[in-house]
């Protein structure tokens, strides 16, 4: 199913009359024998089976939150000089001082609040999510991973493909102009061109909201902002043809998953159906997290204990975005990651203030 005109059955979305198959590589779904991100594998201790308690890990390579006092240096990660002191020899002075006070020479790479990361710090992607992880671990369903690029597309990955999920980088980075690749679904091109009334090659948040509404995909402005943030990796509040195509196909895939999970055809999915939907996307989350998601995205304030399609999309965007950011730091696929204060704030705030 690609596009959203009415079909002959189901929810009535899909421009091919319901008989046209979805894209050959639907985005953000668990494929083949790849276990969902967060599920148990025989070769990786990344997570325990669904609902089971997590065993004690014998590895101490990544300290867990709460294992030491806030601000204390991790045992295996000595602090590097702050950005302004890279060329100065560190002084023998312990990390400390009042929160927000100027850091001493030789302070950690946490540095003072607002300080940037070390310029020589590697991204920690290990080939990017979608590459084969170490120790034979699967790519967790390739959720967020970049598929193979089509040959000679000339568009940095090609339309119909999905952008590599690298580090978000600067949240205020500008978008690179792009165009539609040959063979792009004409409905997608027409939808974008109708929204791009000024012919700038970009559409803003209100234009995107209107374009999706024309295909009976009505979303709140908060959901639209989350879509733009995750598909552009920036807060530019505009989206080009390349990102719009990936977004369009992803929404198509997520609607298909919602329809399959809504077994009673109520137009809402409960906590068990949400669990199945997230597993289809490649995520195995705990019962506590599932209950929290349903409570958060239930329009009735938790009375129905179920979420509708538009809030399901926002739920998927939240789980997808936070998991990708966590995986950037979890380079060893250990289930643990270390964030400095600024990284943590930049990770969480876009989902709180979208």
UniProtKB/Swiss-Prot annotation:
Ca(2+) 2 binds at residues 262, 264, 266, 268, 273. One of its GO terms (molecular function) is calcium ion binding. Residues 1-10, 28-71, 106-117 have a biased composition (Low complexity). This is Probable calcium-binding protein CML50. Potential calcium sensor. Ca(2+) 1 binds at residues 196, 198, 200, 207. The lineage of its organism: Eukaryota, Viridiplantae, Streptophyta, Embryophyta, Tracheophyta. It holds the Pfam family EF-hand_5. InterPro entries: CML48/49/50 (IPR044590), EF-hand-dom_pair (IPR011992), EF_Hand_1_Ca_BS (IPR018247), EF_hand_dom (IPR002048). It comes from the Eukaryota.
């Amino acid at each position: 199913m690609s596009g959203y005109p009415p079909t002959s059955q189901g929810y009535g979305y899909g421009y091919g009359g319901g008989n046209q198959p979805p894209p050959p590589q639907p985005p953000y779904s668990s494929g083949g024998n790849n276990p969902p991100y967060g599920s148990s594998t025989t070769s990786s201790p990344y997570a325990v089976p669904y609902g089971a308690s997590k065993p004690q890990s014998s590895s101490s390579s990544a300290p867990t939150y709460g294992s030491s006092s806030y601000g204390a240096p991790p045992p295996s990660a000595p602090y590097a000089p702050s950005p302004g002191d890279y060329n100065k020899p560190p002084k023998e002075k312990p990390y400390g001082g009042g929160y927000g006070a100027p850091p001493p020479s030789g302070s950690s790479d946490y540095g003072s609040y607002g300080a940037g990361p070390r310029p020589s710090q590697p991204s920690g992607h290990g080939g990017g999510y979608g590459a084969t992880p170490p120790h034979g671990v699967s790519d967790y369903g390739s959720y967020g991973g970049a598929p193979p690029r089509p040959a000679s597309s000339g568009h940095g990955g090609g339309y119909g493909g999905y952008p590599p999920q690298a580090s978000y980088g600067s949240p205020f980075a500008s978008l690179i102009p792009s165009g539609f690749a040959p063979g792009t679904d004409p409905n997608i091109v027409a939808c974008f061109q109708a929204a791009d009334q000024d012919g700038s090659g970009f559409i803003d948040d209100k234009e995107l909201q209107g374009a999706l509404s024309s295909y009976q995909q009505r979303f709140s402005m908060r959901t639209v902002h989350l879509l733009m943030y995750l598909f552009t990796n920036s807060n530019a509040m505009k989206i080009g043809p390349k990102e719009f195509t990936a977004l369009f196909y992803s929404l198509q895939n997520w609607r298909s998953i919602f329809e399959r999970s809504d077994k009673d055809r109520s137009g809402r999915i409960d906590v068990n159906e949400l669990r199945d939907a997230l597993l289809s996307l490649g995520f195995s989350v705990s019962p506590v997290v599932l209950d929290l998601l349903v409570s958060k995205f239930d329009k009735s304030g938790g009375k129905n204990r179920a979420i509708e399609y538009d809030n399901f999309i926002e739920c998927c965007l939240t789980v997808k975005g936070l998991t990708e950011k966590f995986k950037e730091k979890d380079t060893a696929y250990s289930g643990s990651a270390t964030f400095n204060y600024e990284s943590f704030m930049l990770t969480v705030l876009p989902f709180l203030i979208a």
